[in-house]
Amino acid sequence: YATPDFDSLKNFIKKFNEMAKIYYHEYGYKLAYHNHSEEFSNQFFGIEGKRKYDYLTEEFDPETTGFTVDSYWAQVAGIDVRALLERLKGRVRCLHLKDCEANHTVTTADGKTLHVPERIEIGRGTMNFPALIKTAEQTGVKYFIVEDEVYSTNNPLESVKMSADYIGSHLLEK
């Protein structure tokens, strides 16, 4: 969630907690916050050396809220995803599984070459999924969602099959 200043963040947290309370008490659901990379930035407002994600984890009501951790965006931000799950033990029920190709390059319109992490099919990148799944299960994660958003094959169904094949042969108990 993009917040231009600290007051906006506090207002967002207040409203999120208010909505979460309603959903939890009236319907039995917990609202979960899904991260991207910007919540982990060290440049966030420069307040007390905290990151935006630190404020969210401290200020969201643990009774009525939770977190959906996106493995790709956390890794892109330089976060150890397993350590994050351990820190949030019991508060993350859903984990988005995305892999990351570290040596991907793009050329900008002005001809510059940038090295940026790129999403790739599960099992083809740098994420250690067997260790991640083990930590996730030990910390209370119940649901795993594979997000194939970028297709190296230019064929979405082929890319999904590649991810499914990896999961079937490396992550599922036989």
Regions found by a protein language model. Give the residues of each.
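Histidine-acidic metal/acid-base catalytic patches
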Residues: Y53-V69, W73-K174
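Active-site acidic/histidine proton-transfer and metal-coordination neighborhood
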Residues: Y1-G66, L157
